[in-house]
């Protein structure tokens, strides 16, 4: 199933809020539509957010041409898209790449600039697919035959340009013939695990079991989990990692039970400008995502709601970070810095 495609000057994205029971597409004709797709979680996952934002810049520059606006309008478009979601660093990384292309080409004709922006967006997309495969290959070396793997949220093809980061590792292990089983946290409140990860695994024939988030510790105590693999939305220089809310709790449980805890992410998810997780902004989303379930109110009006979308897992709880350039072990600050030099 194609989950996004740019064709006929439109970006068409699969509405992931409707999966797995409805297959509905959202058409982005303008950069404002792209903002909505990111902000409202029609699409999600740090790498995919970056790709979609890049195509948003393309749509924005198309509008500049059609309305005969000054090319400098692109800076407003870049800032607008940057405000869609604050935590995933791939968003800012992709927008910075698009900005650089524009600034190097700004003396060319608008049509030439448009072509170069389109080429860069496609390049970001194509690179991500290749990067995911490499992440999977490196991560597969950590997966033992017969491993029971726990994952959280969705870090699969639906969250990336294709194949996935955490699920890329799982796919590589499965396709290599390893007899693995995946436990999938449902991942409240958006249920990305139950709706998306279980869907992807089932489509590939990978054995999986969906569990409620609060069951993970019990499974670990029973000896049913051999490792935990999750994705990431932003990684600090010291290895602290922001990922879907609930990841921190899993890391604490895994550390207590002596279970390896792996982060799987492209180098573009590393923010080399921040030293620790304390500098990562944590997005808070609408109370209604918790107040309502399947369109029905389940929380009393008198009760307050706290709905952070992410938490930060400290580096000391992380066994290794799997990237396209290899597996990074502690000391993270030293070894992450080396990645930039490679």
Swiss-Prot record:
Q: Which residues bind substrate?
A: 44-46, 85, 192, 243-244
Coiled-coil region list: none
Q: Which UniProt keywords apply?
A: Amino-acid biosynthesis, Isomerase, Methionine biosynthesis
Q: What is its EC number?
A: 5.3.1.23
- Per the UniProt record, the site (Transition state stabilizer) maps to 153
Kindly identify the residues recorded as the active site.
Answer: 233
| InterPro entries on file | IF-2B-related, IF-M1Pi, IF_2B-like_C, Initiation_fac_2B_a/b/d, M1Pi_N, NagB/RpiA_transferase-like
Give the matching Pfam families: IF-2B (PF01008)
Q: Name one GO molecular function term.
A: S-methyl-5-thioribose-1-phosphate isomerase activity
Q: Which Gene3D superfamilies match?
A: translation initiation factor eif-2b, domain 1, Translation initiation factor eif-2b, domain 2
Q: Which reaction does it catalyse?
A: 5-(methylsulfanyl)-alpha-D-ribose 1-phosphate = 5-(methylsulfanyl)-D-ribulose 1-phosphate
UniProt xrefs under NCBIfam families: eIF-2B_rel, PRK05720.1, salvage_mtnA
Q: Which HAMAP family match?
A: Salvage_MtnA (MF_01678)
Q: What does this protein do?
A: Catalyzes the interconversion of methylthioribose-1-phosphate (MTR-1-P) into methylthioribulose-1-phosphate (MTRu-1-P).
What's this protein's name? Methylthioribose-1-phosphate isomerase
Question: What phylogenetic lineage does the species belong to?
Answer: Bacteria, Bacillati, Bacillota, Bacillota incertae sedis, Caldicellulosiruptorales
């Amino acid at each position: 199933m194609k989950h996004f495609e740019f064709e006929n000057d439109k970006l068409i994205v699969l509405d992931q809020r409707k999966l797995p029971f409805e297959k509905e597409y959202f058409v982005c004709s303008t950069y404002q539509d792209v903002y909505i797709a990111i902000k409202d979680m029609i699409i999600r996952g740090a790498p995919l957010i970056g790709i979609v934002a890049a195509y948003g810049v393309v749509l924005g520059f198309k509008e500049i041409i059609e309305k005969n606006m000054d090319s400098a309008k692109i800076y407003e478009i870049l800032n607008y898209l940057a405000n869609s979601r604050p935590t995933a660093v791939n968003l800012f990384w992709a927008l910075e790449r698009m900005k650089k292309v524009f600034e190097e080409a700004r003396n060319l004709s608008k049509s030439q600039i448009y072509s170069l922006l389109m080429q860069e967006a496609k390049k970001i997309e194509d690179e991500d697919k290749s990067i995911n495969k490499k992440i999977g290959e490196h991560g597969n070396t950590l997966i033992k035959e017969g491993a029971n793997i726990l994952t959280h949220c969705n870090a699969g093809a639906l969250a990336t340009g294709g194949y996935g980061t955490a699920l890329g590792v799982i796919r590589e292990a499965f396709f290599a013939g390893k007899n693995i089983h995946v436990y999938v946290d449902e991942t409240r409140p958006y249920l990305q695990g139950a709706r998306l990860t279980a869907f992807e695994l089932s489509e590939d024939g990978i054995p999986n079991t969906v569990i409620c988030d609060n069951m993970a510790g019990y499974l670990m105590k029973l000896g049913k989990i051999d490792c935990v693999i999750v994705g990431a939305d932003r990684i600090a220089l010291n290895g602290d990692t922001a990922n879907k809310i609930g990841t921190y709790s899993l890391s604490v449980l895994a550390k207590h039970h002596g279970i390896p805890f792996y982060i799987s992410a492209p180098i573009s998810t590393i923010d080399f400008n921040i030293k620790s997780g304390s500098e990562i902004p944590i997005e808070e989303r609408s109370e209604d995502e918790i107040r309502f379930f399947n369109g029905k109110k389940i929380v009393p009006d008198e009760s307050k709601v706290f709905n952070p979308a992410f938490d930060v897992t400290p580096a000391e709880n992380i066994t290794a970070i799997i990237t396209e350039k290899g597996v990074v072990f502690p000391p993270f600050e030293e070894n992450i810095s080396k990645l930039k030099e490679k």
